[in-house]
Amino acid sequence: MAGESTNSVGNDITSLIQPGLDQVIQDEGVQVTLINSILGWCRIHIINPVKSSKIVKSRAFQITMIVLGIILLIAGLALTFVLQGQLGNNAFLFLIPAVIGLVKLLATSVFMEKPCTPEKWRLCKRLLQQLKIF
């Protein structure tokens, strides 16, 4: 019985907060602040520890990652055009690694070095909308 009353209170609070959240999340300033918070957490807990590891700092690892990325990009593009007749509409699936790589490059070059600004966020949103991701 007590669990049901707690649930109804939680539902009441959620229904009370939801309209305000929908309105606030549309504000670009709030979006940028949220993105900066998430990127800051990722930078501190994921990126910095990985960057400081010995294997990632090694020249061999860096060269291997660059070569692997180039091979995946070229292979994805080549397979898209070569196998398009056989695969039909599914040929675009070979572009997924290329798109992921481009989004990664965009995110790291635009956001990771400095905080996100509203202008950068508008640019990223526009690019993601053109890719039909966001």
Swiss-Prot record:
Transmembrane segments: 63-83, 92-112
Subcellular locations according to the entry: Membrane
Pfam families found in the cross-reference section: CRPA
Chief place of localization: membrane
Bilayer topology annotation: Multi-pass membrane protein
Keywords of this entry: Membrane, Transmembrane, Transmembrane helix
Entries under InterPro entries matching the protein: CRPA
Record-level GO cellular component terms: outer membrane
UniProt-recorded name of the protein: Sulfur-rich protein
Organism: Chlamydia abortus
Gene name in the database record: srp
